[in-house]
Amino acid sequence: MSIQAFVFCGKGSNLAPFTQPDFPFQTQNKDSTAATSGDKLNELVNSALDSTVINEFMQHSTRLPKALLPIGNRPMIEYVLDWCDQADFKEISVVAPVDEIELIESGLTSFLSLRKQQFELIYKALSNSNHSHHLQDPKKINFIPSKANSTGESLQKELLPRINGDFVILPCDFVTDIPPQVLVDQFRNRDDNNLAMTIYYKNSLDSSIDKKQQQKQKQQQFFTVYSENEDSERQPILLDVYSQRDVTKTKYLQIRSHLLWNYPNLTVSTKLLNSFIYFCSFELCQLLKLGPQSMSRQASFKDPFTGNQQQQNPPTTDDDEDRNHDDDDDYKPSATSIQPTYFKKKNDLILDPINCNKSLSKVFRDLSRRSWQHSKPREPIGIFILPNETLFIRANNLNAYMDANRFVLKIKSQTMFTKNIQIQSAAIGADAIVDPKCQISAHSNVKMSVLGTQANIGSRCRVAGSLLFPGVHLGDEVILENCIIGPMAKIGSKCKLSNCYIEGHYVVEPKNNFKGETLANVYLDEDEEDELIYDDSVIAGESEIAEETDSDDRSDEDSDDSEYTDEYEYEDDGLFER
């Protein structure tokens, strides 16, 4: 089964002040006016199309695209692309906003070059062995710019023409130890009438770094309604999703009586998190198409004069063509075709209108509601909950971002021949990742931390459980505990920071103590810069004014804070309570 993979790169609304939706990349040169993001980006991309473009961009900008935020000194999207290479997908495409796609492509240049060299080494090693028939070239990675305002709109208007078979939608921010074959096999074994399979997981990490972040995560919980179908041979299916805010507003969880009538043994969970991984069948494209194609499909589905229902024949894949000729004695299937689903049958889709001008999480919520809202059942959406023994992290908020880095550090500390390192009387723990270009002065201590390139650590510093972006400068006797320091930031001597987030290019004056604060730059209308201490809710854009706008639709794939309070769209069959 050949599957196309689409990796969505969002803005990262919950990763501020290191990245934030609709935040213009500003330069830090006070002698001139701030350059626009497009001009500066084009200048850097055209001047250096390699990995150094990121470091050079950090010297002028305070924030980065989310896909290029480092996890273990590697852009987070590289872990997703490595995972896709293990799955052997038919095609890999990276979808990002049009103002970030060039920088993301440039930031992955060194990764793509190394990836090609690795495949060449494997080719040389296996060319003379009995496994030469397994040799293949690395899948090309396409970069697709998106001008859509939401991920659902991007899928409907920009990606549907590129899809020619089953496909999977992935985020750019997950780190996991689950082999992709586990999810692919689960998708292959889905029920005949399932249009897609969503992946959910339980948060197994007990992070206690930032209490404010934990409180925000509790407010952003969701009530996930699903059925395990224990009394039948069917696979579990997703039924509905409700937001914590909506339930709090109405003071009770409202579940439709029609849903309870069809699924009396449903389960409601607040511990499940959406992974933003959707394995979709090609039949789903028939529901999501719009415009003249949708009108023609609706016309062919029902005769306006006679009212007779007519058979809808959606485009078929190669495997479907082989199954269609099972009764043909003269038909000879291809010798190389693999047909793991011999008894699959096509679904007679009822082409209900689907509104895709929203995030994909809402689109699949509407598709799950579609399966039971109508008097005639529709095709359901499957759900697969990852086992507790596995580890899955989505770095879509600051707490999870730190957990992802600690997961990589834990793997590094457990590898063989790993030991503590002494550099000029400075102690570097086995659970730390330090770039070779870092400068660490005497009597400093680094434990369970990640230090980016060209970081400068003063003498007698103590860095524990922290993440330092490239170009960070620490004075003497600085203490950092569970902090994230943005690129080119400067921390004065004898400062003590605990559970703090420092934006890039920010300067902390000497002898300051902060705990649980977010320090960010503020750009005034006159292009003047000032420095203030912001509360996390202000930085993350969770003010009441921001909630009333639709500016965060594009970043819904980055977080699970999108609202699920849209009105129901259903066929009035008289079974709903009023």
Curated annotation (Swiss-Prot):
<dbReference type="InterPro" id="IPR051960">
    <property type="entry name" value="eIF2B_gamma"/>
</dbReference>
<feature type="modified residue" description="Phosphoserine">
    <location>
        <position position="300"/>
    </location>
</feature>
<dbReference type="GO" id="GO:0005851">
    <property type="term" value="C:eukaryotic translation initiation factor 2B complex"/>
</dbReference>
<feature type="region of interest" description="Disordered">
    <location>
        <begin position="298"/>
        <end position="337"/>
    </location>
</feature>
<keyword id="KW-0396">Initiation factor</keyword>
<keyword id="KW-0648">Protein biosynthesis</keyword>
<comment type="subunit">
    <text>Component of the translation initiation factor 2B (eIF2B) complex which is a heterodecamer of two sets of five different subunits: alpha, beta, gamma, delta and epsilon. Subunits alpha, beta and delta comprise a regulatory subcomplex and subunits epsilon and gamma comprise a catalytic subcomplex. Within the complex, the hexameric regulatory complex resides at the center, with the two heterodimeric catalytic subcomplexes bound on opposite sides.</text>
</comment>
<dbReference type="InterPro" id="IPR011004">
    <property type="entry name" value="Trimer_LpxA-like_sf"/>
</dbReference>
<dbReference type="InterPro" id="IPR029044">
    <property type="entry name" value="Nucleotide-diphossugar_trans"/>
</dbReference>
<keyword id="KW-0810">Translation regulation</keyword>
<feature type="region of interest" description="Disordered">
    <location>
        <begin position="535"/>
        <end position="578"/>
    </location>
</feature>
<dbReference type="GO" id="GO:0032045">
    <property type="term" value="C:guanyl-nucleotide exchange factor complex"/>
</dbReference>
<feature type="modified residue" description="Phosphothreonine">
    <location>
        <position position="306"/>
    </location>
</feature>
<dbReference type="GO" id="GO:0006446">
    <property type="term" value="P:regulation of translational initiation"/>
</dbReference>
<dbReference type="InterPro" id="IPR056818">
    <property type="entry name" value="GlmU/GlgC-like_hexapep"/>
</dbReference>
<dbReference type="GO" id="GO:0005829">
    <property type="term" value="C:cytosol"/>
</dbReference>
<dbReference type="GO" id="GO:0003743">
    <property type="term" value="F:translation initiation factor activity"/>
</dbReference>
<feature type="modified residue" description="Phosphoserine">
    <location>
        <position position="296"/>
    </location>
</feature>
<keyword id="KW-0963">Cytoplasm</keyword>
<dbReference type="Pfam" id="PF24894">
    <property type="entry name" value="Hexapep_GlmU"/>
</dbReference>
<dbReference type="GO" id="GO:0002183">
    <property type="term" value="P:cytoplasmic translational initiation"/>
</dbReference>
<protein>
    <recommendedName>
        <fullName>Translation initiation factor eIF2B subunit gamma</fullName>
    </recommendedName>
</protein>
<comment type="function">
    <text>Acts as a component of the translation initiation factor 2B (eIF2B) complex, which catalyzes the exchange of GDP for GTP on the eukaryotic initiation factor 2 (eIF2) complex gamma subunit. Its guanine nucleotide exchange factor activity is repressed when bound to eIF2 complex phosphorylated on the alpha subunit, thereby limiting the amount of methionyl-initiator methionine tRNA available to the ribosome and consequently global translation is repressed.</text>
</comment>
<comment type="similarity">
    <text>Belongs to the eIF-2B gamma/epsilon subunits family.</text>
</comment>
<keyword id="KW-0597">Phosphoprotein</keyword>
<dbReference type="GO" id="GO:1903574">
    <property type="term" value="P:negative regulation of cellular response to amino acid starvation"/>
</dbReference>
<feature type="compositionally biased region" description="Acidic residues">
    <location>
        <begin position="544"/>
        <end position="578"/>
    </location>
</feature>
